[in-house]
Amino acid sequence: WKEHAAIPGIARVQPISAPLEGGLLGVWGGFAPKTETKPAQLAMNGASYNAGCGTWTSLPVPADAVGEEVFTGGAAAIAVPQKGVVVVGGVNKDVFLAAINKLPEGYLLHEPEWYRFNNKVLCYRQGAWTQLLQHSSVARAGCALAYWDGWVYVVGGELKPGIRTSEIVRFRVD
C-alpha cells in the first residue's frame, strides 16, 4: 500500500468513486461527522485524482435535470463504457444532514417516502452531469451496481434506514 494525497476539503465518510476518462479517479459526496465543536457537513462536490502527478482537481456537484444539486451519500457509482459514470440512489441531503446532527425522536418509524431517497439516475461524462431517468425503484441507499451488455443492474440496498431489499432492477444505458 502507498498513501496518496488526501482529497481536498472536509473529511469524506462514505463517498462514491469510479474511474474517469484519462486514467483519473473520480470521487463525489461523503460527509464529515459532527464533533464536539462542529456540526456534521456534507461534501456536495467531487474531485478527480491523477495518480501520475499526485494532484486533485475539483469536479462539479452532481445535478438533476432541473439543475438541483444531488447529494451522493449512500449512492452507488459505476463506470459504463462509452457512457461515463452512472450514479444511482443515495440519501436526501436535508433529511440526512438533520438526522446526523440530531437524530429526531421516531426517526426510524416513517414510511420510506418520508426519507426522500434519491430516485434519479445521473451520469457524469466529460465534465458535465445529465439525468438519465427517474423512477421509484432506484430510490435506495447502499445498493450495489453491475454493468453487463448495455444494462445497469441495481442490486439490493436500503429502502429506508434499517429496511433492506433483496430486489434487483435494471435499466438500459445505451
Regions found by a protein language model. Give the residues of each.
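Kelch-like beta-propeller repeat domains
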Residues: W1-D174
